[in-house]
Amino acid sequence: VCHENGAKLGIQLFHPDYNVKALNDLFHQGKMQEARAKLHHDMQHFVNEVTAEELDEIIKHMENCAILAHEAGVDCIEVHGDRLVGSLCSPILNHRTDEYGGDLANRTRFALTLVKRLKTIVPDMVIDYKLPIVTPLGENSFRGKGGLPLDEACIFAKELEACGVDTLHVAQANHTGNMGDTIPAMGTQPYGFMVSYSKKIKELVSIPVSVVGRIVTPEAAEAVITNGSADIIGLGRSLLTDPDFANKCADGHCCNVRTCMMCNKGCTDNIQNRAFLSCVLNAENGYEATRHITPAASSKKIAIIGAGIAGLEAARVAALRGHHVTIFEKSLQIGGQLLIASVPPRK
């Protein structure tokens, strides 16, 4: 379907660095609390050092995933450079004393070996590498651990290009147990907080570089590309808020893009709680197959009393159905309770 409509399809090759079989055994034994503790906090507790033989076995499994993706018609594979791959690269987390630990060459050995083997086994597929960068958080503190500091990331980026990686995706490192590091809520990080890092990486390589991290408007995305900080913009939560973000921009309707407010309530919080993914600004998210705004049988004149959240949404849907809508609001501003909610700091 993607190819029939002129789109390319990519998947992410991801190893969560959990021992999935061990977790599955705990579930089958009815040890739910123990399994849940490991699932939520395994990155800080219950850590075992994977053997070199097990690492090679993991690469074989990832190779098999790439083969299956190729057979399914997938065009691009993104190697997720965080989690297991990132923890091996990390000077903070990796305390190994074998060929996979110590200096930068050893710590990145697994990642580079994986990339080389993928290029060999699926040579006609685009290989993107998600490059997680550890960023400073105050004095002698860091945000994210499962990645590389900028100086090492710059060296590693050039090595990835030399190994045949086609594109690099610059992102905030995670692996701290705090999803807010990589998916920051409103006010916790500046807009475009990874752009300065992608710019440095882009200056060192000749392959395309993408960046992600609180780039929420078409204008901000365009500015990043125009000033040479990246070639591609990565969107995450914004596509839950408005799946037509890119289409609206391509059609010249940037002003109609529904902007993500980074509240994390329907998306990140629900991921953490293993709940249904949703969006507080997009009631259709997750229900695209069943919730359709269809034209009304006849057009009517509709008066909406109050320009609060409910009134504005009712007006929007009514207008899309073909009705002639007039909104009446007694105050000088629309928004209702949102105006009060926006007053506290960081809102």
Which ranges hold each PLM region?
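Flavin-dependent oxidoreductase catalytic cores
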Residues: 1-305, 309-325, 333
